[in-house]
Curated annotation (Swiss-Prot):
Protein name as annotated: Cytochrome P450 monooxygenase sirC
EC number: 1.-.-.-
Domain of life of the native organism: Eukaryota
Residues of this chain annotated as glycosylated in UniProt: N399
Pathway: Mycotoxin biosynthesis
Species of the source: Leptosphaeria maculans
SUPFAM superfamilies per record: Cytochrome P450 (SSF48264)
Record-level GO cellular component terms: membrane
Family: Belongs to the cytochrome P450 family.
Lineage: Eukaryota, Fungi, Dikarya, Ascomycota, Pezizomycotina
Length: 470
């Protein structure tokens, strides 16, 4: 997220930073010197010459780790610096936008914006997601988007609605298998929200891309997902994994990542070859044909499937399970939504497509109360912006929103909404649910503090609704 002035002098800048790092190691002077250097080189001021404020650089990753693992807390405390402030991702500044008028000014030309390379997350991250659709720009983005778009359009998502509704109901019918005490036949079961519901969006998206999967393939794919989750937990910790040195040092994180990349590649290629031998077609075989024709690269396909499947496992799980948890903690709203669903039983497809229902508003409210990330994937404008009175140079990275703005909105946003409603509707028809004791204390829910998104770690009591949903 460098200023364009210094894009033309990477060697000089690297030498200066390297010298400062050496001083840090040898004399313990680095933080003071480095902070002075960064403030000088990336100075952003308003018309009165007042510099843009923000937290001081924290060795060695700036605010990178805090942004991911303590984002909710820090998003409040850092606003003490003002409605527009600066944080550091290692040695790269990111400007954080919080006011609607600045959002409007920044996204006015969103079609020209550039995503940060590998989301400013470093070298090891780039090995699994560096070439994915969400993090590439320009002509590359257009090529890859064109290859994947046919499988995720609004029209296609609407056509899949009856299927996804049936799949959601089937999943809820079997959710008792995740009972924490093994009481699968009981009228009341206890579930962990994430453990019980995360597989539904994962395998639904997997079968959109891969086509029908056998039991062995599903088991293998889920093992890959668990490995991917472990890798992400280590990546957001920063440190040596940001640099290629992690490979030369053969760190355990690098070894695990290399194993995942090889196993993931093998799984995908072998499945595509199997489908072709059997005379079957799927989005996967279509994408491999695009690779053979040279329209996209294999890495672009693999990384974008990874983005849609593994990276978005936590994303969709977050939205779905927080909606369930929040409804569980607000029984009055839960009953109103349940009554609304019952009143629309004769035409659930139309009901699920509507944007003016309490169900839809509840989903939006859960996104507001429990946003996916306090800070979003950084992107940059291609011209200077005046925000809250500060002139921010082009190519400085910004943080903001949920599904994005303009043509770069999330590829699967329509499908994601349908998947979430496809679980919520049968769940509310079949169960009343509430939080178990000690899951919500002093205004705080139990959460997984190791994940890059703030997943809940909440257990629920699920009581079956008598036939008829009364």
């Amino acid at each position: 997220m460098e200023s364009i002035v210094y894009e033309t002098q990477p060697l000089l800048r690297g030498m200066v930073v390297g010298t400062i790092m050496l001083l840090c190691y040898r004399y313990g002077l680095a933080l003071s010197i480095l902070q002075l250097y960064l403030n000088f080189m990336y100075r952003i001021t308003n018309e009165k010459g007042k510099p843009l404020r923000g937290p001081e650089f924290s060795w060695p990753d700036g605010q990178t780790v805090e942004k991911f693992l303590q984002g909710g807390q820090k998003s409040f405390s850092w606003q003490a610096y003002g409605p527009l402030y600066r944080i550091w991702t290692v040695f790269r500044p990111e400007v954080v936008i919080t006011r609607p008028e600045d959002v409007k000014a920044f996204f006015f030309d969103s079609h020209t914006h550039q995503k940060a390379a590998s989301s400013n997350a470093g070298w090891l991250f780039s090995q699994i997601l560096g070439d994915c659709l969400g993090l590439i720009n320009g002509e590359r983005w257009s090529r890859v988007r064109h290859a994947f778009d046919p499988f995720f359009t609004r029209k296609i998502s609407a056509q899949r609605l009856p299927h996804i509704m049936a799949a959601g109901e089937g999943y809820v019918n079997e959710v008792h298998q995740y009972d924490l005490g093994g009481k699968q036949a009981a009228s009341t079961i206890n579930l962990n929200a994430v453990d019980a519901f995360q597989r539904f969006p994962f395998f639904y998206v997997a079968e959109i891309i891969y086509g029908p999967l056998g039991i062995t393939e599903r088991v293998e794919l889920w093992k890959l997902a668990e490995t991917h989750t472990n890798i992400f937990r280590r990546l957001v910790q920063g440190g040596i994994h940001r640099y290629k040195a992690t490979k030369f040092l053969s760190t355990s994180a690098y070894k695990e990542t290399a194993h995942f990349v090889a196993a993931w590649r093998q799984f995908t290629l072998e499945l595509a070859q199997k489908q072709l031998r059997e005379g079957r077609t799927s989005p996967l075989t279509d994408l491999m044909a695009e690779v053979e024709d040279g329209k996209v690269t294999l890495n672009e396909v693999l990384h974008t499937i990874d983005e849609s499947l593994f990276a978005n496992l936590d994303v969709t799980t977050h939205v779905l399970t927080w909606a369930i948890v929040l409804l569980g903690n607000h029984p009055d709203v839960q009953e109103l939504v349940r009554s609304e669903i019952k009143a629309n039983t004769n035409d659930l497809e139309t009901y699920m497509n509507r944007k003016d229902t309490l169900l839809h508003y509840s989903l939006l409210e859960s996104l507001r109360v429990r946003p996916l990330l306090a800070f979003t994937i950084p992107e940059s404008a291609q011209e200077d912006k005046v925000l809250s009175g500060y002139r921010v140079p082009k190519n400085i990275r910004y943080n903001l929103s949920t599904f994005g703005f303009g043509p770069r909105k999330c590829l699967g946003q329509h499908m994601a909404e349908n998947m979430i409603k496809a679980i919520l509707v049968p769940l509310l028809r079949q169960f009343r649910f509430k939080l178990l004791a000690d899951q919500y204390k002093n205004g705080e829910y139990k959460v997984d503090k190791t994940n890059w998104v703030t997943l809940s770690d909440v257990n629920l009591e699920m009581e079956r609704v008598p036939s008829g949903g009364s």
